[in-house]
């Protein structure tokens, strides 16, 4: 992941995130993500998972409206509609949510 993240082709934009996708079955993929800023593999990345699922569905001409995702952070589903021109819309990411932190901050406004 780091090798791609720092590749010179992405220097002008400050590097890139990198998603590795493996087909599990026709409608399920496994995704691992190396994230810029974190500089390591993360448990999950919503934008990377969504983009990977749409790219996978498009490349494989899937006739369904969702792709199942296995990520280190848990199992997810990406739902979408594909119109007659081949455009994807109404894209949703579904998965379990868990609060991992709560806090507050006091702002001093003048």
Model-identified regions with their sequence ranges:
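Active-site proximal loop and beta-alpha junction motif in alpha/beta enzyme cores
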Residues: 1-44, 51-110
């Amino acid at each position: 992941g780091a090798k791609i993240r720092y590749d010179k082709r992405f220097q002008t934009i400050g590097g890139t995130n990198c998603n590795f996708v493996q087909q599990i079955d026709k409608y399920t993929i496994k995704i691992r993500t190396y994230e810029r800023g974190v500089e390591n593999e993360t448990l999950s990345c919503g934008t990377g998972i969504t983009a990977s699922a749409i790219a996978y569905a498009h490349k494989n001409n899937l006739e369904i409206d969702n792709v199942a995702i296995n990520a280190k952070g848990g199992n997810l589903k990406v739902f979408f509609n594909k119109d007659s021109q081949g455009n994807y819309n109404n894209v949703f990411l579904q998965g379990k949510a868990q609060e991992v932190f709560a806090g507050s901050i006091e702002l001093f406004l003048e």
